UniProtKB/Swiss-Prot annotation:
It comes from the Eukaryota. It comes from Arabidopsis thaliana. PANTHER family: VESICLE-ASSOCIATED MEMBRANE PROTEIN-ASSOCIATED PROTEIN, VESICLE-ASSOCIATED PROTEIN 4-3. Residues 1-14 have a biased composition (Basic and acidic residues). This is Vesicle-associated protein 4-3. Residues 99-221 form the MSP domain. Residues 1-45 are annotated as: Disordered. It holds the Pfam family Motile_Sperm.
Length: 287
């Protein structure tokens, strides 16, 4: 009996040795799983905390360094040619520099005489350091012209031009000061690299370099009501006549075509004036 019990005890101890690792593995498996889940939970909490901290810092972070310029790669949608340079942007923000000084500066004054050709005058001075060509443009070329119609001015040179206009008879017995005119004059300028003779084609050939100096609006003055503007107009017209005579004398010895603006009398004005005078005469005869 004792042998049997000892044998069974020894067998139990032997089997116990073999069973011990399995028991330890079974008992340690939940512990490893628990440690893994705790590590995963800890890492997720840490990652979430870092993400929240990064978002919080990025919201309140302000960059105080030099501006970052994005490079243009081959796959960039916008080409470098379409991006304006800093110099072109700066030029677009700056006001246009005038080459000419005008007197009057924005309006052309005419005496209001219906059915007649009237005149105005304007002084033009080159205030730049280069030779400048100028020319007139008008919205009604059939009833207006300028003399001279254009010229090239040296730096500091001044010229006085005469502007001719036919005044339409009033409609519905409108008073002179109520007569509105939609006629406008535009003065264009072109910087010349080298002095040359004036030709109107210059403005078409170099249209990308042409500048608009001023758009002049027409204002009528009552010749029967003396005022400062009317007196100034008379003085400028007398000066323009003297300058015109000087140009004519200077061009008498020139063989070839006359200067631009000379002798450009529009026959349509004569026809309108004759019709207007005929209407006036018809009214007098009827009376």
């Amino acid at each position: 009996m004792a042998l049997t019990e000892d044998k069974s005890d020894s067998d139990g101890r032997r089997w116990g040795k073999f069973k011990l690792p399995f028991r330890n593995s079974n008992s340690q498996a939940p512990s490893a799983s628990s440690s893994s889940s705790m590590a995963t939970s800890s890492s997720s909490v840490t990652s979430s905390h870092l993400n929240q901290n990064y978002i919080h810092q990025s919201r309140h972070f302000q960059y105080h360094g030099p501006p970052v310029v994005e490079g243009l790669g081959q796959n960039h949608h916008q080409s470098a040619a379409t991006i304006p340079s800093m110099s072109s942007v700066a030029r677009s923000l700056l006001p246009t520099k005038r080459r000419l000084k005008l007197d009057p500066s924005a309006k052309l004054y005419f005496p209001y005489e219906p059915g007649k050709q009237v005149r105005s005058a304007i002084k033009i001075k080159n205030t730049s350091k280069s030779h400048v060509a100028f020319k007139f443009q008008t919205t009604v070329p059939k009833s207006c012209f300028m003399r001279p119609a254009g010229a090239i001015l040296a730096p500091g040179e001044e010229i006085i031009a005469t502007v001719f206009k036919f005044v339409e008879p009033p409609e519905n017995n409108e008073k002179p000061m109520e007569q509105k005119s939609g006629v406008k004059f535009k003065i264009m300028s072109l910087k010349m690299k080298v002095p040359t003779d004036y030709m109107p084609e210059l403005f078409e050939e170099q249209k990308d370099h042409v500048s608009e100096e001023q758009v002049m609006r027409v204002v009528f003055l009552d010749p029967e009501n003396p005022n400062s503007m009317m007196e100034k107009l008379k003085s400028q017209l007398a000066e323009a006549d003297a300058a015109d005579e000087a140009r004519k004398k200077a061009s008498e010895g020139i063989v070839g075509p006359k200067p631009i603006g000379e002798g450009l009398v529009i026959d349509e004005w004569k026809q309108r004036r004759e019709r207007y005078l005929a209407q006036q005469q018809g009214g007098v005869d009827a009376a």
